[in-house]
Amino acid sequence: MNIKSTWVVFLTLLFFIPFAPSLAADSSGTSMPPMQAIAAAIKKVAFSPSSSTPAKNDLKEHIAEQQEAIVFTAPPRETPEQGMEIYKPVAEFLSKTIGERVVYKHPGTWGVYRTEMLKGGYDIVFDGPHFNSYRMEKLSHNILVKMPERFEFAVIVLKEQKISTVAQMAGRTFCAHAPPNLGTLVLLSQFDNPSRQPVIISTNGWDNIYAGVASGKCLGGVVPVANLKKYDRAGNMKVVLKTQAMPNQAFSAGPRLSAEDQTKIAQALLSPDAAGPTAKLRAAYKVGDSFALANNQEYRGLAEFLRNEWGYY
């Protein structure tokens, strides 16, 4: 019975009958056998069975169907339409890889992204190293493949500025992406006293951050070293701080996927067959020709950059 028909029946009963009985829905749980570790690159993870409620109408059936699917997501850096264009081919490729339905789900907002992540609502995720590290430590995810180029950030000011240390920039303006962007969190981690932190002027795009510093809109900025080399060919900037290299964005998989399926996903994303399905993703994030194999150990400790972000700790 659809929603419109249900509403008509309800109004009819309300008119003729003074009281209507309430309906109760039963719920049942399913259990899965424990996983077996089948590959040295994939650590053994715990499986938490999900419970489902028998569908009573089309809406509940649709919700149940979505819950049963393996959910693939990425941060809301793109619009829902852009996200679908970039990530849906990857989801379809992974569906064929493991023989289960994988759906791409755009989170909508950063708040929803955080909330759903902490609830364990995402099974496969592509995002930054600090998020991968957090899911590994807190949500039993394994990190499968990564962008091969390592991440290094530079805190920059115009060359003529009489500034030589980050400490001198306390309370000053910085062009940077809004947190929880990793570059911004790396910058903020340099200031122990929150009252002495720089003022972040939210700026989208590394090129716009560089331009903001060059134009004098902001005293400083934080950009990847690779981007700085491209933008600052004239040598107008001074690097006040350069971070240690760290692993780049990566795919992680959670405990609803067996160790066998996680291995299949990693192998598939590294294979030549992934070239087509991942083409738009690789182009959007300048991955190069292919991803590289990742491991949990190299991401350990990077979750600390989320320590002062609300909701994570």
Predicted features by range, described:
Residues 95, 99, 118, 192, ...:
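Sec-exported extracytoplasmic/periplasmic mature domains
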Residues 71-77, 149-157, 233-273, 283-309:
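Periplasmic-binding protein-like
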Residues 107, 111-168:
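Acidic, polar ligand-binding/catalytic clefts
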Residues 86, 90, 109, 113, ...:
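Stable alpha-helical elements in mature extracytoplasmic
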Residues 2-3, 11, 19-112, 118-120, ...:
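N-terminal hydrophobic or amphipathic helices and topogenic motifs
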Residues 67, 73-95, 130, 152-211, ...:
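Bilobed "Venus flytrap"/periplasmic-binding protein-like clamshell domains
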Residues 126-138, 212-237:
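A ligand-binding cleft/hinge motif common to bilobed small-molecule-binding domains
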Residues 104-115, 199-211, 246-247:
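Short helix-initiation/N-cap motifs at beta->coil->alpha
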